[in-house]
């Protein structure tokens, strides 16, 4: 592309039964809108009120379907993104004018999906059509609410909570949101799941203009990286598509917003005002400065407004006479956006690994050409590889003979040999300087003229060796450790460089220690693997691994025991979850609960040992400091007395010698205790992870047991044998998911089954159903944990 182009601006009119035909007229080419207002007679005879406006656009979408909107607005920008061009699609307009519907659409109906899900679908369809390229797709979802940044995908299980607030960072590659999670997606369904997850976390509120009004700006970004599968070229292309759903502007005097809605509207209007200022500055060719940093919105979109990307604006307006003032304001913004010019360019980068391989091939080819050139010049046995130690020693010998005069000249072979000759000249010169200095030191005592302390010491005691030869030199300073309360629980698990297998090995060497049995990974499906088995005093790693294999071979904990068959019948009314949880821990979950308690007791024992070790370390540190003070006192006392042997060496007494030995032993104890503390901390982190996983398993098993025991539909109960118990696996998971479903849920299942839209809608509906099921499960778990705390 490479040429400058204008930003494309489209207008979409919200359908209404009360369309102002007399005031709003469309051009014949469907690329202009004319607005006509009647003069207000209340202003008198002299009335200079403007009554006519005309706006030139790239297209007017009136009564247009979602398919037509996407084909007109976004399809070209998305297809060019796979060729390496960045793209930005933005929806702007009044509150309730249809921005979110245009961008996201209705997630309940496949036909009514918006630009965003259609763009995801097009990306993965085009990837399938390009088998010669390996294309990686990542997505992120950013929300800007009241000038604060939020990650809409931070609620996913594998995304940890952010410790520091999110910030906008600029680097040579563009704008980077520090703290924003970016998720790899290899399938269309995974991308839809992330979209629905973010939509669930968006902030919406009821408004006079819209019952479900978006109260924040949202930016969904699709990152793409394409490598060639056939070519060995180190060059590859990257691109990103920013899909921006802006919050709606409003006139506070007309909407009458109050309280929190008023505060939100103030922030929204302020950020949109700064956005318009940035657009005006970009459209003015004489402006050198563009105020991007005035708001989080403009700063986050700095590399997406103009620049080297394809930009498309969709302005959503009302067609009613009552909203004509806001419609004019939105159309002015669209006309100003059309003044902004962009210069799209392909984003090319270079793969360092492939570049190294290509350079190695080129180097080998150049060596072959050089060998041919040497053979044609009758030069044989010329080596251009890096020199080894033997060749360097030979050059060093030639340099020495040249300096001594026994060698007249040094033959020049190649550039590498010339560089090494100069290097050996430097080495020989340095060695000669050291030899001269050593000879002077043997004959004279060298003292720095600026070292007044050394001069005074020599004058005082008459020593030739100003440094002296003392027994036991002081080493580096150590540090102390604070003792944390035993009951304190860390808010976040610290990172450790040790793997679980390393932690197990280190703890197995401790005498009398109880170590967690660990395989390659902790298997949540087999809860028996999470049990912490104490090891014998002289046990080794092989015995522990044998125990682990025996433990892992145990059948699942839930068995068809006679006790379950003889249980009392369940009451007709389901008990509360708190009572049912206690019953579950005594019956079905007794084994899981026992393992959980054992793991927790071993974790507490490790924490107690760590606290005791910390106290011992602090005591040893205090004793080391006291011993150092005593040793320094003895040294100063000895230096004052000035006791020396005939050779000029200082003499230390027995008391000072014992202090030196004691200090050495204390430091050894300190190192051993500190190493033990590090091992204990690693074990504590590993045990804490096992306890958390065991707790999660216990709650998950309880939820399944509760639904199977008290929430089974009547037709499933009739199908079961009389008096038999309900075990996991007897009830299909689809029936468990449907427990307590209402008419809307049944309609959703029917909608997914029938799929009138065709096979392309399968991934869309699957992602929607999975996201809804996950959020329902999370709500159930939160309610259960709250009732358990009470």
Curated annotation (Swiss-Prot):
Principal location class: cytoplasm
Single GO MF descriptor: microtubule motor activity
Sites where the protein binds ATP: 12-14, 93-100
Keyword annotations from UniProtKB, A to Z: ATP-binding, Cell projection, Cilium, Coiled coil, Cytoplasm, Cytoskeleton, Flagellum, Microtubule, Motor protein, Nucleotide-binding, Phosphoprotein
Coiled-coil regions listed in the entry: 342-442, 600-695
Chain positions with Phosphothreonine modification: 530
UniProt keyword annotation of Glycoprotein present: no
PROSITE patterns: KINESIN_MOTOR_1, KINESIN_MOTOR_2
Entry-linked Gene3D superfamilies: Kinesin motor domain
Domain of life from the UniProt record: Eukaryota
InterPro entries, sorted: KIF6/9_C (IPR056524), Kinesin-like_fam (IPR027640), Kinesin_motor_CS (IPR019821), Kinesin_motor_dom (IPR001752), Kinesin_motor_dom_sf (IPR036961), P-loop_NTPase (IPR027417)
Subcellular location: Cytoplasm, Cytoskeleton; Cell projection, Cilium, Flagellum; Cytoplasm, Cytoskeleton, Flagellum axoneme
Tissue spec. comment: Highly expressed in the testis (at protein level). Weakly expressed in the brain, thymus, lung and heart.
Cross-referenced CDD domains: KISc_KIF9_like
Region annotated Disordered, chain positions: 482-521, 547-577
GO terms classed as biological process: extracellular matrix disassembly; microtubule-based movement; organelle disassembly; regulation of flagellated sperm motility; regulation of podosome assembly
Disruption-associated phenotype: Mice exhibit impaired sperm motility and male subfertility and flagella show an asymmetric waveform pattern, which leads to a circular motion of spermatozoa.
Subunit and partners: Interacts with HYDIN.
Purpose: Essential for normal male fertility and for progressive motility of spermatozoa.
UniProt-recorded name of the protein: Kinesin-like protein KIF9
Organism: Mus musculus (Mouse)
Gene of this entry: Kif9
């Amino acid at each position: 592309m490479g040429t400058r182009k204008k930003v494309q601006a489209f207008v979409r009119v919200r359908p209404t039964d009360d369309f102002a035909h007399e005031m709003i007229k469309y051009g014949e080419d469907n690329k202009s809108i004319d607005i006509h207002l009647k003069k207000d007679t209340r202003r008198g005879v002299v009335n200079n009120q403007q009554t006519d406006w005309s706006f030139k656009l790239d297209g007017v979408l009136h009564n247009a379907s979602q398919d037509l909107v996407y084909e007109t607005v976004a399809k070209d920008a998305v297809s060019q993104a796979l060729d390496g061009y960045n793209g930005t699609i933005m929806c702007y307009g009044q509150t309730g004018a249809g921005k979110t519907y245009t961008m996201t659409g209705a997630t309940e109906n496949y036909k009514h999906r918006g630009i965003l899900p259609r763009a995801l679908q097009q990306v993965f369809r085009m990837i399938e059509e390009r088998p010669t390229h390996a294309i990686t797709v990542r997505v992120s979802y950013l929300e800007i609410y009241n000038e604060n940044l939020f990650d809409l995908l931070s609620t996913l299980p594998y995304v940890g909570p952010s410790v520091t607030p999110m910030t906008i960072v600029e680097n040579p590659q563009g704008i980077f949101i520090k703290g924003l999670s970016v998720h790899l997606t290899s399938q269309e369904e995974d991308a839809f799941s992330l979209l629905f997850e973010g939509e669930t976390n968006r902030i919406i509120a009821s408004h006079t203009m819209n019952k479900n009004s978006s109260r924040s700006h949202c930016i969904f970004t699709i990152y793409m990286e394409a490598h060639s599968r056939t070519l060995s070229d180190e060059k590859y292309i990257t691109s990103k598509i920013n899909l921006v759903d802006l919050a709606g502007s409003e006139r506070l005097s007309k909407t009458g917003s109050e309280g929190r809605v008023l505060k939100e509207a103030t922030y929204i209007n302020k950020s949109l005002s700064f956005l318009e200022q940035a657009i005006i500055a970009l459209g003015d060719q004489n402006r050198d400065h563009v105020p991007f940093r005035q708001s989080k919105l403009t700063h986050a979109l700095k590399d997406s407004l103009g620049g080297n990307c394809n930009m498309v604006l969709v302005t959503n307006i009302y067609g009613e006479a009552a909203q004509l003032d806001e419609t004019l304001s939105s159309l002015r913004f669209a006309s100003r956006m059309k003044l902004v010019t962009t210069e799209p360019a392909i984003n090319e980068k270079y793969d360092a690994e492939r570049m190294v391989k290509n350079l190695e091939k080129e180097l080998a080819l150049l060596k072959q050409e050089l060998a041919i050139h040497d053979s044609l010049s009758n030069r044989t046995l010329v080596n251009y590889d890096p020199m080894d130690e033997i060749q360097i020693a030979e050059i060093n010998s030639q340099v020495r003979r040249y300096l001594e005069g026994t060698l007249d000249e040094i033959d020049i072979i190649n550039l590498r040999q010339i560089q090494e000759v100069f290097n050996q000249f430097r080495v020989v010169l340095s060695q000669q300087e050291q030899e001269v200095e050593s000879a002077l030191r043997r004959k004279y005592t060298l003292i720095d003229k600026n070292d007044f302390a050394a001069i005074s010491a020599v004058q005082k005691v008459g020593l030739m060796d100003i440094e002296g030869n003392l027994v036991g030199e002081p080493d580096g300073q150590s540090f102390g450790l604070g003792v944390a309360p035993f009951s304190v629980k860390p808010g976040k698990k610290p990172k450790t460089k040790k793997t679980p297998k390393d932690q197990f090995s280190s703890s197995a060497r401790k005498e009398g220690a109880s170590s967690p049995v660990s395989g390659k990974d902790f298997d949540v499906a087999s809860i028996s693997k999470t049990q912490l088995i104490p090891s014998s005093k002289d046990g080794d790693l092989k015995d522990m691994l044998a125990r682990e294999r025996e433990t892992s071979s145990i059948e699942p904990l839930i068995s068809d025991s006679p006790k379950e068959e003889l249980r009392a019948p369940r009451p007709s009314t389901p008990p509360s979850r708190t009572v049912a949880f206690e019953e579950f821990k005594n019956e079905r979950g007794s084994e899981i609960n026992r393992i959980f308690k054992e793991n927790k007791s071993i974790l507490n024992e490790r924490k107690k040992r760590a606290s005791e070790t910390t106290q011992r370390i602090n005591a040893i540190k205090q004793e080391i400091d006291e011993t150092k003070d005593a040793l320094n006192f003895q040294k100063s006392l000895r230096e004052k007395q000035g006791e020396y042997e005939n050779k000029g060496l200082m003499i230390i007494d027995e008391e000072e010698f014992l202090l030196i030995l004691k200090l050495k032993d204390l430091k050894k104890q300190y190192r051993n205790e500190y190493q033990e503390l590090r091992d204990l901390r690693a074990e504590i982190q590993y045990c804490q992870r096992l306890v958390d996983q065991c707790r999660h398993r216990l709650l998950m098993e309880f939820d399944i047991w509760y639904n199977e025991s008290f929430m089974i539909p009547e037709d499933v109960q009739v199908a079961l044998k009389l008096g038999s118990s309900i075990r996991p696996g007897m009830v299909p998971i689809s029936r468990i998911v449907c427990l307590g479903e209402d008419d809307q849920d049944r309609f959703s299942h029917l909608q997914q089954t029938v799929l009138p839209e065709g096979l392309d809608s399968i991934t869309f509906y699957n992602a929607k159903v999975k996201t809804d099921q996950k959020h329902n499960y999370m709500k159930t778990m939160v309610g259960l944990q709250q009732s358990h705390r009470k």
